[in-house]
Amino acid sequence: MENSTSLKQEKENQEPGEAERLWQGESDVSPQEPGPPSPEYREEEQRTDTEPAPRMSPSWSHQSRVSLSTGDLTAGPEVSSSPPPPPLQFHSTPLNTETTQDPVAASPTEKTANGIADTGTPYSDPWESSSAAKQSTSHYTSHAEESTFPQSQTPQPDLCGLRDASRNKSKHKGLRFDLLQEEGSDSNCDPDQPEVGASEAAQSMLEVAIQNAKAYLLSTSSKSGLNLYDHLSKVLTKILDERPADAVDIIENISQDVKMAHFNKKLDTLHNEYEMLPAYEIAETQKALFLQGHLEGADSELEEEMAESSLPNVMESAYYFEQAGVGLGTDETYRVFLALKQLTDTHPIQRCRFWGKILGLEMNYIVAEVEFRDGEDEEEVEEEGIAEERDNGGSEAGEEEEEELPKSLYKAPQVIPKEESRTGANKYVYFVCNVPGRPWVRLPSVTPAQIVTARKIKKFFTGRLDAAVISYPPFPGNESNYLRAQIARISAGTHVSPLGFYQFGEEEGEEEEVEGGRDSYEENPDFEGIQVIDLVESLSNWVHHVQYILPQGRCNWFNPIQKDEDEEEEEEEDEEKGEEPDYIEQEVGPPLLTPISEDLGIQNIPSWTTQLSSNLIPQYAIAVLRSNLWPGAYAFSNGKKFENFYIGWGHKYCVENYTPPSPPPVYQEYPSGPEITEMNDPSVEEEQAFRMTQEPVALSTEENEGTEDEDEDDED
């Protein structure tokens, strides 16, 4: 302590001389090398300029303190020749840059000290040192910072100011050096230990802050299920992979693309099956419709065939229906037109008509109504032959079974046979396809049982002809049969024409009229047309030109009581037993060409509605007829031409919700008789009365038996 106080006094006495020598040295620019700086200057510069260094490298700080202490003791009178220190600045530059910041050249002893310092702190991290320096203890440098901060901010060129600053600085240097020596002598612990603990606390706080920030970025959104951390990672990855120009201008679009990528189907390592979109598949199938041969160089025979072609002018009918607000659109109508041409070219068709379109849940049905030429309907003949063989085989097998098994008392109702081809409900043949360009499929003939059951159920079409129809009552067939039954019902109820367009032939006999009405007609060549206003104002100017379907399921009534010879014999036996045969009245419906004004409505709802296609230009408008019983059925007429069209779900209008019919009554399994008739048990009084009546009878029988035995003994 005595050495430190004596050194402090000498330093205060020598400070004025050191300041004068500094200014003289700068003015004279002596070529000689200046003396080495004082140890106090080196220690103060190291403590102020590189304050974090002792905390990062404890070994270096210890060596520097040892060098400073030994330097103070061995400096001698040469200390007074050291120049005054420059103004201090607050920065954390490494120790090896101190010589460049000092305006006065360093002495060899200072270079040696710097070299020792450099070797003592290898691989120092400036980032860690700067962060640790902010949180280190401040009781070592608080006085130095308070004295040097004003000097560094406001440097004055005045000599007096420099002298005062150097005097105050030297005082603080001595005081700080004394404190360091007192700490080194009084305590054996390292002064850097508090700084190490503070750095560890700072690192732990930094890690916690980083974890909290990352947890916030990883928080999942309640709407999209994404988090910001993954999204930013993907955005940056996409930018670095693609490296677009001016990425900062399109970063919003890149972020949107990254979000949209979540909705795309991710491909795996397996080879996925090539899936053709339905639109492309339909386009491929419809391409064949447009690859038709040109008409250049056509022969005269081809021209005659074109003149007698059975292909209808679908585009003309679509033009009129478009005025009524009904149709499929120009594109689809033209494709249907080409599909009908393909149908007429591949089949011997005499007459063809676009019937309409039935909607389905999965696919729709495009329906074509055709009539084959005479003798060309070979498929129908084959079907009839196969059906007859099945009936004959079934009857033979049934006879064999009847011989073996006892006769059943149950009499099944007679099956109503279907109508022959070209008559009744099977007058026309219908082809369907799901999309124009796909193969046309012929629908089977309809049977009365299918029509009767179709009236009791209501099912949506699926678009697949082989689909099963699950309903109650059970439908006898699949969806193709159900579709054919609905087409027959819709045609019978909605196909109408202007009055006088058709007429009955003169060659038909009167017997047909008496039996069941006429079933054929022909076009009237003398038809002059009806005014459009008359067609709209009166429903009597429209007539049905399709036969009415009877409740039996046929257009022509069939008598189920017609019996063969064997059945007549059985009927005679039943009459002898007293059983009366059943009689069924003949079903009669409205005849052909009956005005639609006689049609029955549903609960004050008329069956038909008429209107003009345009009320603004009535002189060029057409008459439009809409069915209320079959929604989707339309008809138009411009006075001379007419056409019918249907587009809908194939269901009849129902005021109330559909309710399936109730099941039929239970059939009696066994005939009732006295042998199996159950009676109530008698009471006690009834049993006693019965016994009283039975006792005299029993006594009389015993007496009779006794007399008989005596007579036998006498005879013996």
Swiss-Prot record:
InterPro entries on file: Radial_spoke
Q: In which tissues is it expressed?
A: Expressed in the trachea, ependymal cells and oviduct (at protein level). Abesent from sperm (at protein level). Expressed in brain, kidney and testis.
Compositionally skewed regions (Polar residues) per UniProt: 58-72, 90-102, 127-141
Give the superkingdom in one word: Eukaryota
PTM sites of type Phosphoserine:
S395
Comp. bias intervals (Basic and acidic residues): 8-23, 40-52
Taken from the UniProt entry, a GO cellular component term is: extracellular region
Q: Which locations, inside or outside the cell, does it occupy?
A: Cytoplasm, Cytoskeleton, Cilium axoneme
In this chain, the stretch annotated as Disordered covers 1-167, 374-413, 564-586, 668-716
Q: What does this protein do?
A: Functions as part of axonemal radial spoke complexes that play an important role in ciliary motility. Essential for triplet radial spokes (RS1, RS2 and RS3) head assembly in the motile cilia.
Q: How does it assemble?
A: Component of the axonemal radial spoke 1 (RS1) and 2 (RS2) complexes, at least composed of spoke head proteins RSPH1, RSPH3, RSPH9 and the cilia-specific component RSPH4A or sperm-specific component RSPH6A, spoke stalk proteins RSPH14, DNAJB13, DYDC1, ROPN1L and NME5, and the RS1 complex-specific anchor protein IQUB. Interacts with RSPH1. Interacts with RSPH3B. Interacts with RSPH6A. Interacts with RSPH9.
Quote the protein name from its UniProt record: Radial spoke head protein 4 homolog A
The organism is Mus musculus
Q: What is the lineage of its organism?
A: Eukaryota, Metazoa, Chordata, Craniata, Vertebrata
UniProt lists the gene as Rsph4a
